[in-house]
């Protein structure tokens, strides 16, 4: 079903429980390695879709020196792109509240960069999804932030959580990309190996 994938030991280098959940849904055997501290800054001339792809390669490069032949490393990074600016993970409760206020009643893009790496080659790609939020009340925003603690999520929200149920008006593109891993696109790339 997945071509020559059985010749690789698949390693998901991620601290994200959502990426682990999505990988498990593919039904492939894989192991998880915790990400070391990786500098997630990026060159100022990058914009939008280029940013998470660049960071996913940086994450892969942090592992490259310890990789063994036969290993296939998967790294990813997700950003929310609103009005030409990156919304990464919020800093604290008030940062999350501010991000959700800025998303309320607007459309934005979610970009996830994915990097596939072996000792012999590296390939990266980006997926994009458009998300439109309904207008959120201050009460809804604060309820969500207090109950769901979205400080580990780009844009301060999980589309699969309460805020997605009540606030997401429309989506164009991959739902799973918004969760943090464009699993259909990843599956297509893995089939090519």
Swiss-Prot record:
Which reaction is recorded as catalysed by this protein?
Answer: dTTP + H2O = dTMP + diphosphate + H(+); UTP + H2O = UMP + diphosphate + H(+)
Name of the protein this chain belongs to: dTTP/UTP pyrophosphatase
Q: Is this entry keyworded Plastid?
A: no
Give the record's GO biological process terms. nucleotide metabolic process
Q: What keywords are assigned to this protein?
A: Cytoplasm, Hydrolase, Nucleotide metabolism
User: GO molecular function terms here?
Assistant: dTTP diphosphatase activity; nucleoside triphosphate diphosphatase activity; UTP diphosphatase activity
Cross-referenced InterPro entries, in alphabetical order?
ITPase-like_fam, Maf-like
Recorded E.C. number(s)? 3.6.1.9
Asked whether the UniProt record includes Cytoplasm among its keywords, one would answer: yes
Cellular localisation: Cytoplasm
Q: Name the coiled-coil region(s).
A: none
Catalytic residues in the record: 77 (proton acceptor)
Please list the cofactors this protein needs.
a divalent metal cation
As for family, the record states:
Belongs to the Maf family. YhdE subfamily.
Q: Which organism is it from?
A: Bacteroides thetaiotaomicron (strain ATCC 29148 / DSM 2079 / JCM 5827 / CCUG 10774 / NCTC 10582 / VPI-5482 / E50)
Q: Where is this site: Important for substrate specificity?
A: 18, 78, 160
Report the function annotation for this chain: Nucleoside triphosphate pyrophosphatase that hydrolyzes dTTP and UTP. May have a dual role in cell division arrest and in preventing the incorporation of modified nucleotides into cellular nucleic acids.
Please provide, in alphabetical order, the Gene Ontology terms of the cellular component aspect for this entry: cytoplasm
């Amino acid at each position: 079903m997945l071509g020559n994938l059985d010749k690789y030991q698949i390693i998901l280098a991620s601290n994200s429980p959502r990426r682990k959940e999505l990988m498990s849904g593919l039904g492939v055997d894989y192991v998880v390695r915790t990400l070391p501290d990786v500098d997630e800054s990026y060159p100022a001339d990058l914009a939008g879709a280029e940013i998470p792809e660049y960071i996913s390669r940086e994450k892969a490069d942090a592992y490259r020196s310890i990789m063994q032949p036969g290993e296939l490393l998967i790294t990813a990074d997700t950003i929310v792109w609103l009005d030409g600016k990156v919304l990464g993970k919020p800093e604290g409760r008030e940062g999350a509240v501010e991000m959700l206020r800025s998303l309320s009643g607007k459309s934005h893009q979610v970009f996830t960069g994915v990097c596939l790496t072996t000792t012999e080659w590296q390939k990266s790609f980006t997926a994009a999804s458009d998300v439109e939020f309904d207008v959120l009340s201050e009460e809804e925003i604060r309820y969500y932030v207090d109950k769901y603690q979205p400080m580990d999520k780009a844009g301060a929200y999980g589309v699969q959580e309460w805020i997605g149920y009540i606030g997401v008006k429309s989506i164009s593109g991959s739902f799973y990309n918004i969760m943090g891993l464009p699993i259909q696109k990843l599956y297509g790339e893995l089939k090519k190996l």
